[in-house]
């Protein structure tokens, strides 16, 4: 798919898809008992409140005219008891729903994060990370309330509406029908505003996502911004994105704000009709004052759940766009996964074979075409060639970070597509060009390669890769705290820490993808000595820009145009005076010029 940038809006789904809500219901099922209890408590609390107008009617029509103060006192006590019970039930219900809401947040966020962990590298390459973050954090928070309190309130307010209608008809049928005359008008109004609201809130979702993506990108690239004095230009872009957010928000709120005045206007008209109609009939002696007051109270109650449902409707429209984005992420295909009956990979000896392997990222262009080679256990295989030739794709296929289009990849005679990914990768050490450092201590970053490693094991791995010297000079040594992405470390130091982390995992197959590109020549020489000892007995694949670092490899493969152009040791390839010879001599001449 095409790459998505901070300037690019994500595609909006035109029709509302009820399947989103049906799918979301799976997160509610495990809490349905607690939600039913919450509904019952709320319904009881609401019913208590709706009995109050009937008590008021009895007080106005019987207790006060008859000056029956004992009855009046009893009615007042009954009112207080009803309101107290209602408050208690609603409080308990609120406590239950807070717990349910937080549990739903946890469940959705856990599933979303676990799925993100399985997505291919290309997914993260094609999207601003800020757009991914906002889905996991902000969007999940927003939809959780809709899935818990929102759904419960729909049921609750529907029950409330039913109770009110029943009580109205018990008090007076004619005046109850007057109240219901406003319902068709309200229905037409809500249908009209529905689609406009949904599109408006989807636009808000897009613009907020764009702003978040740009902000995250600029926080990471703050140093580059200052180096190139781009503060003013970036501030203008941020202002433009913020104005887009403000514009779409104002449009969405304008539609949302129409709901309340619309319902309120209908409510006022209906209540006016009750008094006009009721007073005419009352004048004829057919209706009591208590009846009119009771119906007026119920009319007020009647529109309250409708207004609440309107508010819930607004929130649903707002959050459906977020729910779509969450499920869109969950539906991203995991391109590399275990087969149904995948086996555990036995202990790896290290023979790796590609048998006429072909691979492409899409159907338009083959990255690798008919690639075949065998690296024996304990051998070191180097991949060299121009940028974009397919070197990194080969090592990603070895670790099964990608799937081949055709041709088996075999490790120790076992097709790696038939084994579990975890059992395969847990026996491999992979060191990429981009050395990522997590926030925490230096020791914790190294221990990431083997969570059970002792301090001695961590130091041993660090010494082998020449990282121990600079770590020991840090303020707290291995306990020195490093910030996100290792901002306080040089690029070379970050790579040395990553080397120690990789070697600590004690891999059977070691993959180094431009792993020494950011290390100075002097450090690289010292590191090479340690690596040579570490590579003994391990199969290794090495991609290196500086060809001097791979001279000692058992097998050097020159990759170009998706295939292996030539293979052999350094001496053999130099004797051929082919592709490798030309690349090596050109690089050697460049070194002499800069010396």
Q: How should these model regions be labeled?
A:
Residues 3-14, 102, 110-140, 213-237, ...:
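Short intracellular "coupling" helices and adjacent cytoplasmic loop segments at the cytosolic face
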Residues 338-339, 345-595:
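ABC-type nucleotide-binding domain
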Residues 40, 48, 52, 77, ...:
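Hydrophobic alpha-helical transmembrane segments of ABC transporter permease domains
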């Amino acid at each position: 798919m095409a790459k998505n940038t901070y300037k690019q809006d994500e595609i909006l789904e035109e029709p509302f898809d009820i399947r989103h809500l049906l799918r979301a219901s799976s997160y509610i099922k495990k809490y349905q008992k607690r939600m039913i209890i919450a509904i019952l408590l709320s319904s009881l609390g609401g019913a208590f409140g709706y009995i109050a107008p009937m008590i008021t009617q009895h007080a106005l029509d019987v207790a006060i005219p008859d000056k029956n103060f004992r009855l009046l006192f009893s009615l007042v006590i009954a009112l207080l008891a009803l309101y107290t019970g209602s408050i208690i039930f609603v409080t308990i219900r609120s406590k239950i729903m807070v717990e349910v809401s937080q549990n739903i947040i946890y469940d959705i966020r856990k599933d979303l994060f676990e799925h993100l962990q399985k997505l291919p590298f290309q997914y993260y390459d094609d999207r601003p990370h800020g757009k991914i973050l906002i889905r996991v954090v902000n969007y999940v928070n927003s939809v959780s309330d809709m899935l818990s309190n929102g759904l419960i309130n729909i049921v609750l307010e529907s029950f409330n509406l039913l109770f009110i209608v029943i009580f109205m008809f018990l008090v007076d049928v004619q005046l109850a029908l007057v109240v219901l005359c406003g319902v068709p008008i309200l229905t037409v109004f809500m249908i009209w505003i529905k689609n406009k609201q949904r599109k408006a809130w989807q636009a808000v979702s897009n613009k907020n996502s764009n702003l978040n993506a740009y902000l995250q990108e600029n926080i990471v690239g703050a140093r580059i911004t200052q180096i190139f004095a781009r503060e003013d230009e970036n501030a203008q872009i941020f202002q433009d994105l913020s104005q887009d957010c403000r514009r779409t928000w104002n449009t969405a709120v304008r539609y949302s704000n129409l709901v309340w005045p619309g319902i309120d206007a209908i409510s006022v008209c209906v209540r006016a009709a009750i008094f006009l109609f009721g007073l005419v009939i009352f004048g004829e002696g057919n209706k009591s004052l208590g009846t009119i007051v009771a119906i007026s109270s119920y009319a007020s109650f009647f529109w309250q759940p409708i207004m609440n449902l309107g508010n819930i409707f607004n929130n649903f429209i707002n959050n459906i766009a977020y729910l779509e984005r969450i499920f869109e992420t969950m539906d991203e295909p995991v391109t590399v996964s275990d087969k149904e009956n995948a086996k555990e990979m036995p202990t790896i000896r290290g023979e790796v074979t590609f048998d006429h392997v072909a691979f492409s990222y899409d159907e338009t262009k083959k990255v690798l075409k008919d690639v075949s080679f065998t690296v024996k256990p304990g051998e070191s295989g180097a991949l060299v060639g121009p940028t974009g030739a397919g070197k990194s794709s080969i090592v990603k296929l070895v670790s099964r970070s990608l799937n081949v289009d055709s041709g088996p990849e075999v490790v120790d005679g076992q097709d790696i597509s038939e084994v579990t990914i975890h059992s395969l990768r847990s026996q491999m050490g992979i060191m990429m060009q981009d050395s990522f450092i997590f926030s925490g201590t230096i020791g914790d970053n190294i221990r990431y390669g083997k969570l059970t490693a002792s301090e001695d094991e961590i130091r041993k791995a660090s010494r082998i890769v020449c990282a121990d010297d600079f770590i020991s000079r840090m303020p707290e040594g291995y306990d020195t705290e490093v910030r996100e992405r290792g901002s306080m470390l040089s690029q070379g130091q970050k790579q040395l820490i990553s080397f120690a982390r990789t070697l600590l995992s004690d891999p059977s197959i070691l993959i180094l993808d431009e792993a020494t590109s950011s290390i100075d020549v002097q450090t690289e020489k010292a590191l090479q000595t340690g690596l040579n000892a570490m590579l003994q007995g391990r199969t290794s694949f090495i991609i290196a820009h500086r060809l001097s670092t791979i001279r000692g490899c058992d097998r050097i493969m020159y990759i170009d145009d998706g295939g292996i152009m030539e293979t052999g040791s350094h001496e053999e390839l130099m004797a051929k005076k082919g592709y490798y010879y030309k690349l090596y001599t050109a690089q050697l001449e460049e070194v002499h010029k800069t010396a």
